[in-house]
Structures are given as structure tokens and as C-alpha cells.
A protein has these predicted regions:
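HotDog/MaoC-like acyl-thioester-processing domains
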Residues: 2-15, 93-155
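Hot-dog-fold acyl-thioester-processing enzymes
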Residues: 2-88, 154
Length: 155
């Protein structure tokens, strides 16, 4: 075994996107019909009290943020057709989501870090945070998502 250092790629820096706002422009409302359909599709009964299924943490924040997935990828100079991959998603609920209630979505891009990958060649790790709140600002949840953006052309 050699004590030679592992060669590193001289990678160009990723786009400077940290701090870009992901605030939504209009409220997102979980309808009772949409919640019922989602619950039925996964084999659970919707609750009688109007509580929405917890997966709406992801649906509501993704749909309600100020960019589409393609737009978010584009800001990172990444073509959505090249296949972004979810690496992780963490959520902290302050209270349960309910149907019929409009929610505001705010958020921002936290970081975009470029690094070598044995499987992908080069990849960017995109981290962004989203918050969902009532119109009066009462927090409902906060989520942090990390996506892998494969940069095959840089490999």
C-alpha cells in the first residue's frame, strides 16, 4: 500500500445560491378531498377531526414554495431532466396540519456543496429549508431537505 495522497479533482465551484429565498407567493391549502384521496391511496382512513396526513409536510412545502422543482434545479444550474435525487428530509412539527386551513411557506437555500463521488463522478449536495406557518405567523413545521444533483459532465 502506498502512502501517496489520493488525487483530487480540480472542480469548478458550484453556483453561489445560498440565501436565495424559496418563499411562496400564495397560501397553500390542503383540501379535505385531496387528503381523503391520499389517505385512500395508501390504505388509511382520513381522520374525522380534519387532521391532514403527515406526508403533507413535504407536499405542502414543495408545492407551496416560491419555485417549482425545475426552477430550483435551474437556479443551481442543473437540468431537472438529469435526475435530482433526494438524500434526506427532516421535519419538526409544531402542531398537526389540518384540512381547509391556508398555510404560508417560507424558506431559503442553505448551501450547494460540490464534491467528488465514486458512483456519480461529481455531485452537488443541495440543502434547503422550508417553514410552513399560519397566515398570522404561527409556526406549524420546519423541514430541511438535501438533494443530490449528479454532475456527470464534470466527471
Amino acid at each position: 500500500m502506498s502512502n501517496q495522497p489520493t488525487p483530487t479533482l480540480d472542480l469548478p465551484p458550484p453556483p453561489q445560491v445560498a440565501g436565495i429565498s424559496l418563499a411562496g407567493t400564495k397560501p397553500y391549502t390542503i383540501s379535505a378531498d385531496e387528503n381523503r384521496a391520499l389517505c385512500e391511496s395508501i390504505g388509511v382512513a382520513p381522520t374525522a377531526d380534519g387532521t391532514a396526513h403527515p406526508i403533507y409536510f413535504y407536499i405542502a412545502t414543495q408545492v407551496g414554495m416560491g419555485m417549482t422543482v425545475a426552477g430550483l434545479c435551474s437556479v443551481c444550474e442543473f437540468d431537472v431532466e438529469e435526475g435530482p435525487m433526494m438524500a434526506s428530509s427532516k421535519v419538526t412539527f409544531s402542531r398537526p396540519l389540518v384540512t381547509g386551513q391556508p398555510y404560508q411557506i417560507t424558506g431559503r437555500i442553505v448551501s450547494l456543496v460540490r464534491k467528488p463521488s465514486r458512483k456519480l463522478g461529481v455531485m452537488d449536495m443541495l440543502e434547503y429549508s422550508l417553514e410552513l406557518s399560519l397566515p398570522d405567523g404561527t409556526p406549524m413545521l420546519a423541514t430541511t431537505n438535501v438533494w443530490v444533483l449528479p454532475r456527470r459532465r464534470l466527471a
